[in-house]
């Protein structure tokens, strides 16, 4: 079993790096504002048709463009969900959503969280899934990538005030990265057996003579961007464990690759744009070390079996509860770590049924900010915050002004970095406390004791860090939970983007300093260790008390 797990992890990472390297070169061209070959004429026509100017923006203008697009998308999606019964492509005549569920869903998909307090096949029409959710899957992913584009430019430009043009970046990211790759993935899914139709639900007779209603819909097209954009919201309630979404072991492997593809490619692009590819490799090493350790822990915990069943004398050599038999324990464990390390949230197994230790690792990966590869764009700019913090700590230890890529890190940058890092822990801890203090929060818990608290903590961690997965033992479709989680998702997304853009605006105006003998190298194993230690230290100090009340207490009981 250990050899199989090692081979699975090694194969996954090897294929990932091979695919991400050329994509990273393409992203580097976009960051450097170099159009891809053959696209200049198309871009010129589109810019003219849309009335888009390619004049560069300062950080405030860039931020306002990103926020404006997302707020408009939020309003459109909210009213679309409220009135879906008036809109076409609704063969099942599904009614509009309640105001609180519509708000929660709209915020969820606009913020790239894709938390779902509903069952897709019984709640949303084809039009809502396509024109509403799928469109936001593209736009939210493009928004995250655009923000990291601006931050990378801030490190490479000197004595400037502009960071690029948000509209140009969004258009290029969507047209030349997200749409083509998602199209290829969707076609592959269709070839493997995923659904893609507009038929009404089909009544079929089972082999036992009973009648069953099979849901239909344009699944493959949404499934592709759901994974590529680290969105995670399933067309069906069972998400990627549903055979209509994820029909074969091969599609399952491709889904995991798609989740990590752009975050990995952005690390390669970062190294290429900065002129020092070792910087990108440093980030990949730090992310990969944490990732491999976490996968190993989850695999080990799930292979040990369920201790509660073992205590009863039952056969539980491995923990298969809540897992698809066609995928097994090792693949389910790998997928769980992939989807929570990134801000995806898609699942092929019920995380609520993992062992206490196996379920704690995915929760902790979300709580540290999903910086281990992370979401498209958001993972890298989240990790860059920890890089700045690590550089600052190193500067304190050696008595020098901290520098990164030749830019001095001053008080303003550190205040903004601290603010951005503290946003999500504050939301998680205060949100969980509020839920446990109120009757409306506690009434949604279906399980008592430490596991019930773990379900609450997981839900708020997932929302605040824009992941979207759940422990599922929580009746979250209520006004209290819909509003609480919507607030956490909204602030967790934009409360980090705003200080990140402010940091970019501050750094782009500075001159780059030449490296000296006293400059801390930020590309070697020493800095990789310092960066990993910073991530672990912040995560451990912040969440150990809360984790001790939930999964740790459950593990020890």
UniProtKB/Swiss-Prot annotation:
Signal peptide: none annotated. GO terms for cellular component: plasma membrane. The keyword Ribonucleoprotein does not apply. Keywords: Cell inner membrane, Cell membrane, Ion transport, Membrane, Potassium, Potassium transport, Transmembrane, Transmembrane helix, Transport. The chain crosses the membrane at residues 5-25, 63-83, 132-152, 170-190, 253-273, 283-303, 329-349, 356-376, 379-399, 416-436, 484-504, 526-546. It comes from the Bacteria. It is found in: Cell inner membrane. It is a multi-pass membrane protein. InterPro entries: KdpA. It holds the Pfam family KdpA. One of its GO terms (molecular function) is P-type potassium transmembrane transporter activity. Its main location: membrane. The system is composed of three essential subunits: KdpA, KdpB and KdpC. Belongs to the KdpA family. PANTHER family: POTASSIUM-TRANSPORTING ATPASE A CHAIN, POTASSIUM-TRANSPORTING ATPASE POTASSIUM-BINDING SUBUNIT. Part of the high-affinity ATP-driven potassium transport (or Kdp) system, which catalyzes the hydrolysis of ATP coupled with the electrogenic transport of potassium into the cytoplasm. This subunit binds the periplasmic potassium ions and delivers the ions to the membrane domain of KdpB through an intramembrane tunnel. This is Potassium-transporting ATPase potassium-binding subunit. The lineage of its organism: Bacteria, Pseudomonadati, Pseudomonadota, Gammaproteobacteria, Enterobacterales. The gene is kdpA.
């Amino acid at each position: 079993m250990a050899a199989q797990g090692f081979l699975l992890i090694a194969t996954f990472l090897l294929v990932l790096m091979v695919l991400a390297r050329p994509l990273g070169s393409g992203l580097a061209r976009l960051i450097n504002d170099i159009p891809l070959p053959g696209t200049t004429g198309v871009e010129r026509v589109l810019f003219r048709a849309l009335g888009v100017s390619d004049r560069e923006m300062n950080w405030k203008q860039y931020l306002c463009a990103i926020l404006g697009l997302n707020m408009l998308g939020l309003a459109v999606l909210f009213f679309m969900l409220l009135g879906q019964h008036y809109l076409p492509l609704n063969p099942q005549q599904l009614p509009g959503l309640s105001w609180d569920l519509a708000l929660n869903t709209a915020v969820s998909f606009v913020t790239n969280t894709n938390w779902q307090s509903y069952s897709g096949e019984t709640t949303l029409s084809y039009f809502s899934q396509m024109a509403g959710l799928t469109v936001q899957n593209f736009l939210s992913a493009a928004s995250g990538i655009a923000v990291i584009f601006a931050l990378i430019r801030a490190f490479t430009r000197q004595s400037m005030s502009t960071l690029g043009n948000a509209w140009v970046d969004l258009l290029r990211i969507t047209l030349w990265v997200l749409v083509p790759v998602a199209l290829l993935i969707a076609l592959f899914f269709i070839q493997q057996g995923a659904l893609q139709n507009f038929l009404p639900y089909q009544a079929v007779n089972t082999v036992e003579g009973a009648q069953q209603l099979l849901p239909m819909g344009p699944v493959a097209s949404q499934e592709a961007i759901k994974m590529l954009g680290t969105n995670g919201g399933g067309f069906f309630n069972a998400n990627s464990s549903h055979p209509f979404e994820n029909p074969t072991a091969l599609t399952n492997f491709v889904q995991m690759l798609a989740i990590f593809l752009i975050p990995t490619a952005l690390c390669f692009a970062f190294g290429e744009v900065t002129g020092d590819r070792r910087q990108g490799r440093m980030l990949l090493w730090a992310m990969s070390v944490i990732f491999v350790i976490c996968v190993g822990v989850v695999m080990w915990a799930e292979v040990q079996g369920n201790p509660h069943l073992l205590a009863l004398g039952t056969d539980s050599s491995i923990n298969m509860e809540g897992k698809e038999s066609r995928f097994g324990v090792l693949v389910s464990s790998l997928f769980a770590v992939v989807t929570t390390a990134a801000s995806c949230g898609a699942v092929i197994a019920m995380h609520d049924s993992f062992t206490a230790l196996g379920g704690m690792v995915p929760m902790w990966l979300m709580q540290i900010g999903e910086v281990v590869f992370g979401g498209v764009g958001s993972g890298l700019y989240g990790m860059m915050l920890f890089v700045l913090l690590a550089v600052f700590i190193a500067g304190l230890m050696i008595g020098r002004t901290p520098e990164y890529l030749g830019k001095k890190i001053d008080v303003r940058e550190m205040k903004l970095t601290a603010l951005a890092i503290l946003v999500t822990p504050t939301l998680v801890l205060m949100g969980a406390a509020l839920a446990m203090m109120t009757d409306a929060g506690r009434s949604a818990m279906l399980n008592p004791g430490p596991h019930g608290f773990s379900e609450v903590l997981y839900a708020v961690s997932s929302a605040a860090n824009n992941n979207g997965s759940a422990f599922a033992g929580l009746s979250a479709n209520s006004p209290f939970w819909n509003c609480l989680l919507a607030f956490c998702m909204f602030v967790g997304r934009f409360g980090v983007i705003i200080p990140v853009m402010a940091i970019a605006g501050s750094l782009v105006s500075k001159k780059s300093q030449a490296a000296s003998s006293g400059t801390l190298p930020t590309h070697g194993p020493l800095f990789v260790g310092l960066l990993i230690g910073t991530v672990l230290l912040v995560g451990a100090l912040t969440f150990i008390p809360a984790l001790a009340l939930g999964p740790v207490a459950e593990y020890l009981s």
